[in-house]
Amino acid sequence: MKKIPYCRITCDGNELRYIKEVLDCGWLTTAGKTQELERRFAEMVGARYALAVNSCTAALHLAAEAMGIGRGDRVFVPTMTFTATAEVLRYLGADPVLLDVEYGTNLLTPAILEAAAMRYPEVKAVMMVHYGGQAAQMDTEDGHEGLLEVCHRHGLGVIEDAAHTFPARRNGRTVGSLGDVTCFSFYANKTITTGEGGMLVTNDEAIARRVKVMRLHGINRDIWDRFTAVKPSWEYDVVAPGFKYNMPDLNAAVGLAQLERAEEFRQGRERCARRYLANLTGLPGLDLPVLQVRPEDHAWHIFPIVLRPEASLTRNRCIELLAERGIGTSVHYKPLHRMSYYQQTYELGAERFPNAERTWQGCLSLPLFPTLTDDEVDYVCAAVGDCLKAAVCGSVG
């Protein structure tokens, strides 16, 4: 029996070389490698500023703080996302207003956001999640206005949660080059990793200045500057009560090696996704991801499928059957409105989120990583097909 994990990390490039350079230098925390990673990342996504932090959660928190979101404010958040997207608002005393998403893409659409903005005119901003590696429709397409136009008309600030979506494009525009601020993840299972880490990018100088200070205790001097400049290291000011969100150079060293291969890794994921699509299309009772971008513009962070009710196979049972064949899976996501904290705090009912509910009842994510072989993809697809056929015959459920 094959053993195919849900995720397999690739770190066989310049990672050890760059880590050794940091160790030989003797300066392990934030310094030259972090600055180089920031510069190269900004160039790649087409942003003026990039600021490395220790997680995408930290980036989201800093973004919301820098945009002035605070106690009593309300912010739109899609319910189909990881809890970090909403929890950072609670850190600041703000409230998430959860929204349903489009079935098949799990993205906010201009129509969904327009209706929500009309219903909740007091909302200050939106957390725009680019789900699964596919960018949401930010710009006008085919004469239909995009999410940014809706935001501008209603005075909504835009924080893009692009934890899934690097590198990615839509209509020639790179994710990270459009909104007020965009946050990326370098967690272990992402396209590129630093182990733990994230990046915040923006074209707004004021936001960049604020984030740079707040990511390290609200101190107005970088730690590298404090210990390398002529001015004494202890001569600095604390301008606000900040956070401990900086990225060490050891992590940045890994990130630099990974960044060199970002497109290679993305292409490997795309190859697997195309094979999944070819093999699984047409299977009864199965919905595949709906593509709104070219496959080559998709980051392919995950490959989610949805078992429809007529499949006669529950998601949990399918996961069990695949595990029996050595296949790892995951679920993206249990919607936030089903989490006890959000249910109890905001009295949310499932009827408000029909598309997310439809997805949640049958969704699972198949293995997807750049070193996944064609034979392994075929093995997974055959196993999924066997599960569906057995369910139709009544031998599983």
In which residue ranges do the predicted regions lie?
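N-terminal "arm"/small-domain region of PLP-dependent enzymes with the aminotransferase-like
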Residues: 1-28, 236-239, 367
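Phosphate-binding glycine-rich loop
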Residues: 27-74, 88-92, 98-100, 173
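PLP-dependent aminotransferase class I/II
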Residues: 34-39, 47-50, 57, 111, ...
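A generic structural signal for well-ordered alpha-helical segments
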Residues: 42, 89, 149-151, 280-281, ...
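Conserved PLP-anchoring active-site segment centered on the Schiff-base-forming lysine
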Residues: 61-119, 125-127
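Helix C-cap/helix->beta junction micro-motif
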Residues: 92, 153-154, 325
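Active-site phosphate-binding strand-loop segment of PLP-dependent enzymes
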Residues: 104-194, 199-207, 314, 369
